[in-house]
Amino acid sequence: MNVVQQTFAELSIGEPEKRVEGRVYSVSGPVVVGCNMIGCAMYELVKVGSEGLAGEIIKIDKDQATIQVYEDTSGLCVGDTIVRTGLPLCAELGPGLFESIYDGIQRPLREIRESSGGIFIPKGVNIPALDREREYEFVPAVSAGDYVVGGDVFGKVYENSLIETKILVPPKKSGKVAFIACRGNYTLKDVVMELETGKGKEEMFMYHTWPVRIPRPIEEKKNATHPLFTGQRILDSLFPCVQGGTTAIPGAFGCGKTVISQSLSKYSNSDAIVYVGCGERGNEMSEVLMEFPKLTVGGKDDSIMKRTVLVANTSNMPVAAREASIYTGITISEYLRDQGMNVSMMADSTSRWAEALREISGRLAEMPADSGYPAYLGAKLAFFYERAGSVVCLGSPRRTGSVTIVGAVSPPGGDFSDPVTSATLGIVQVFWGLDKKLAQRKHFPSINWNLSYSKYFSNLEPYYEEVDPGFIVNRTKCREILQLDDDLSEIVQLVGKNALSETEKLILDISKLIKEDFLQQNGYSRYDNYCPFTKTRLMLRNIILYFDNSKNAITNYKLSWSTIRKETEDVFYGLMKMKFVMADKEMEPKLNKLKREIEGVFLKMLG
């Protein structure tokens, strides 16, 4: 880390006008080799050609530098100029991020459309990521004479009705406050604070920049103990993730990865969402832009877009920018985390990012590893996922925040032995494996309950004990029933259902009830698109209560399963209808009433 920071500090050495211009030596797709580049640094941002195409130095050899260009390189000639900026690729962080849609290197797409009038991004366009003309009401939080350090909150602005943005001192900056602006309306161009540092006075604005490849510093990482509620019953009950966790969603084409990612964006208990469309179809980002403004948060009239940042790097955009889009997204997420928010970042899909790495690696003639991917694929993925976590933020007042990363993986043909999937599974703690067969049977979410897993149960046990002590037992029994059903399915195919014992017949029918009326969920219906955790645990409680009573009647009272089913037909039908109960104030009384009916039926039947 120290070497990276030192390199970053050294990038600014030398005045821009004194730097020697480089020249284009060769062009191969998005990879450009420049000569006469003595003094340049790794990951320095450069402008290539007369149109000023943005690029980043990824390899240095004597006076030659290899540059990956984030725009279309057609039309570049040998001998064209390369202008060094002396800075790494940075993200602009401040008020105005929400409700925006950016490309992979944080250029605002709406503003580009308005300025150019076309539907494609012009070459060399240079529009700031944050609107410099928009006014915000600034409320100072420090006074002149106070000493501040990196991460301290020195003011706040109300960005919209959902978000209050804290204005932070950039990390690595500190000093005595010489001037602080009074409460009032300011733009991002206005100086709102001046610091007296060892090098003289330094002006502070409401925004600052940060290199996308360097993780933002924190006070300390802490153990994540609060669940990330998704509104999907199978995820919240059987395979939960924590706020600050890492999750992979691998699945073949058409299995529903994007729908799950979008459901998380719409309904999860996160304060902010950063949705990165990396190399996926443009229609998916269009869907998000069309649907999200209509959705509201927590029953209020506020659009869900007010807490969402979109980074769109679709499949028809330059390949090199895919790599940058993931880093841009995680840097924005870390900045929002430093505000004290719980942030969810959706990366859809990391496979396309890995394919971009493979293409660049091939152009550099690096030694390929498995399936042509570079040997450092695992290290790059690990570095990205390690930026997730629940943390104590830098500076004062004390704040805690988290970044949860949900990475969709698109293995070719749904093959989970694909190098990207294998490398991802070695890093993440939660695996939501999508099954093509379930998707073909129209069972959605098509998450395979036998393959998927979560390693966060021990972290979440204290939370579950506090909310519902019986939930852990019910969940374990549910997993056992599904596992036994999987074992019995082969026997049924061989000898038929009649050869099974009464308990085994019960297990088959209850597992069918669990799969069709608990795990299956219609994401496009009003009653089932979102299921709160209270409804999830009460539904599971009622199913397991019915199972336990039925098993007791078979074991101790020697009743047949067909007799029990006939006698309890009404409550069994009630269990099947539970998912149609709307998530309102009548929900708990209705599900508790069904519980009492189940207990009453068995009490009457068994005397």
Swiss-Prot record:
GO terms for molecular function: ATP binding; ATP hydrolysis activity; proton-transporting ATPase activity, rotational mechanism. One of its GO terms (biological process) is ATP metabolic process. It holds the Pfam family ATP-synt_ab_N. Keywords: ATP-binding, Hydrogen ion transport, Ion transport, Membrane, Nucleotide-binding, Translocase, Transport, Vacuole. Its EC number is 7.1.2.2. It is found in: Vacuole membrane. It catalyses: ATP + H2O + 4 H(+)(in) = ADP + phosphate + 5 H(+)(out). The keyword Ion transport applies. One of its GO terms (cellular component) is vacuolar proton-transporting V-type ATPase, V1 domain. It is a peripheral membrane protein. CDD domains: ATP-synt_V_A-type_alpha_C (cd18111), ATP-synt_V_A-type_alpha_N (cd18119), V_A-ATPase_A (cd01134). The keyword Oxidoreductase does not apply. ATP binds at residues 251-258. Gene3D superfamilies: 2.40.30.20, 2.40.50.100, Bovine Mitochondrial F1-atpase, Atp Synthase Beta Chain, Chain D, domain 3, P-loop containing nucleotide triphosphate hydrolases. Catalytic subunit of the V1 complex of vacuolar(H+)-ATPase (V-ATPase), a multisubunit enzyme composed of a peripheral complex (V1) that hydrolyzes ATP and a membrane integral complex (V0) that translocates protons. V-ATPase is responsible for acidifying and maintaining the pH of intracellular compartments. V-ATPase is a heteromultimeric enzyme composed of a peripheral catalytic V1 complex (components A to H) attached to an integral membrane V0 proton pore complex (components: a, c, c', c'', d, e, f and VOA1). Belongs to the ATPase alpha/beta chains family. PANTHER family: H(+)-TRANSPORTING TWO-SECTOR ATPASE, V-TYPE PROTON ATPASE CATALYTIC SUBUNIT A. This is V-type proton ATPase catalytic subunit A. It comes from Encephalitozoon cuniculi (strain GB-M1) (Microsporidian parasite). The lineage of its organism: Eukaryota, Fungi, Fungi incertae sedis, Microsporidia, Unikaryonidae. The gene is VMA1.
